[in-house]
Swiss-Prot record:
EC number of this enzyme: 2.3.1.31
Pathway named in the protein's UniProt entry: Amino-acid biosynthesis; L-methionine biosynthesis via de novo pathway; O-acetyl-L-homoserine from L-homoserine: step 1/1
Protein localization: Cytoplasm
Any one GO biological process: methionine biosynthetic process
Known role: Transfers an acetyl group from acetyl-CoA to L-homoserine, forming acetyl-L-homoserine.
Region (Disordered) residue spans: 1-20
Encoding gene per record: metXA
Family: Belongs to the AB hydrolase superfamily. MetX family.
Protein's recorded name: Homoserine O-acetyltransferase
Pfam families according to UniProt: Abhydrolase_1
Length: 382
């Protein structure tokens, strides 16, 4: 994959966007003022696009990625992205998000490590931001995305779609800027972080920051990174993404092939989790993992808006809310609350899966149907 150089900082309009073939561009969006009052100067976002803009700029669909995702929604692995697209089959000609009709845009989130300004980026003093990068919230991530669309001249999105941390951003778009969203798809997330989620996620953060190579978060120029800690964090997280039934069906209490757990060898499930950890450590910045996990802990659409019920009740955006029946990280009742409180939601759509939280990624046929329904709403309300 080629990567466009950053457009001229003074550029505005559609010329800021990358080509419609999935090429990654690094787009300047200006200074971003955070909820905390802090300002991150000269923010850039990694952006990919599939499909052409309509003359009226009214066909844009924003796809929001989850914690360790990025803007690479579809496409093969390449020199920029070590993995294929995380929603392959969902975008393209004739796909649920049909690029013969829609212009699909995805950003790498503020604080990310795939083209967007984050802890590993260069600060104004020429050194990595590291521990100096400000704490951010999900709302701050949406503020950065809104700044991108302001610069392009897109004032209303035909749809915003996403799951997990991406679903948090969808909700913040709906609640914080309903006039800018014609339709939405919210998957595998709740209105606020729960104690269980915060407990699991702070444990992952502790694993990373306890690694001696964390170095207070200022490791980027040292040649050492806290990959041992992040590997442990990923193993913890992955257990919450899957289910007891699925894991036991695949691995039971079997030893890894050719190894004996009674003689220092590994269990099959242990080997699987180590593999997941190693894959992440090759492609993801631990400081971004900590920063974004902290942002998820802060997720609460009701903060400063009179509580969850009041915030959702005041949100008129037509939407589809979906949940996975086996999800133990974001249980189905958290999506039921959204469906009950959002005026624009007709009912909760339940995805049946053995895969738990990851079902919003793996159950492509079911998710494709929800995307088709969301695009129908977008067509009717844009």
């Amino acid at each position: 994959m080629s990567t466009d150089q950053s457009p001229c900082p003074s550029a505005t309009g559609a010329e800021l966007l990358p080509p419609p073939d999935g090429t990654l561009a690094i787009v300047p969006v200006g200074d971003i003022r955070l909820e905390s009052g802090a300002v991150i100067p000269d923010v850039h976002l990694g952006v990919q696009r599939w499909g052409e803009l309509s003359p009226g700029l009214d066909n844009v669909v924003l796809v929001e990625h989850a914690l360790t995702g990025d803007s690479h929604v579809v496409g093969p692995a390449d020199d920029v992205h070590q993995l294929p697209g995380w929603w392959n089959g969902m975008v393209g000609p004739g796909a649920p998000m049909d690029t013969d009709e829609w212009c699909v845009i995805a950003t790498n989130v503020l604080g990310g490590c795939k083209g967007s300004t984050g802890p590993g980026s260069t600060a104004p003093d020429g050194k990595p931001w590291g521990s100096r990068f400000p704490a951010i919230s999900i709302r701050d991530q949406v503020t950065a995305e809104a700044a991108l669309f302001d610069r392009i001249g897109i004032h209303r999105l035909a749809a915003v779609v996403g799951g997990s941390m991406g679903g948090m951003r969808v909700l913040e778009w709906m609640v914080g800027a309903p006039e800018r969203v014609a339709a939405a798809l919210v998957l595998a997330v709740g209105a606020r972080a729960t104690a269980d989620q915060i407990g699991t996620q702070t444990t992952q953060i502790a694993a990373i920051t306890a690694d001696p190579d964390w170095q207070g978060g200022d490791y980027h120029d040292t040649g050492r990174a806290p990959t041992t800690g992040m590997g442990i964090a990923r193993r913890i997280a992955h257990l919450t993404y899957r289910t007891e039934d699925e894991l036991d069906h695949r691995f039971a209490n079997h030893a890894q092939d050719g190894e004996d757990p009674f003689d220092g060898g590994r269990w099959a499930v242990q080997s699987y989790l180590e593999h997941q950890a190693e894959k992440l450590c090759r492609r993801f910045d631990p400081a971004t993992y900590v920063l974004l996990t902290e942002a998820m802990n802060r997720h609460d659409v009701g903060r400063g808006r009179g509580g969850v019920a009041a915030a959702l009740a005041a949100t008129p955006v037509p939407c589809v809310v979906g949940g996975v029946d086996s999800d133990r990280l974001y249980p189905l009742h958290t999506q039921q609350e959204l469906a009950d409180l959002l005026p624009g939601c007709a009912r909760l759509e339940v995805v049946h899966s053995r895969d738990g939280h990851d079902g919003f990624l793996t159950e492509t046929a079911a998710i494709g149907k929800l995307l088709v329904e969301t695009m129908r709403l977008a067509r009717a309300h844009r």
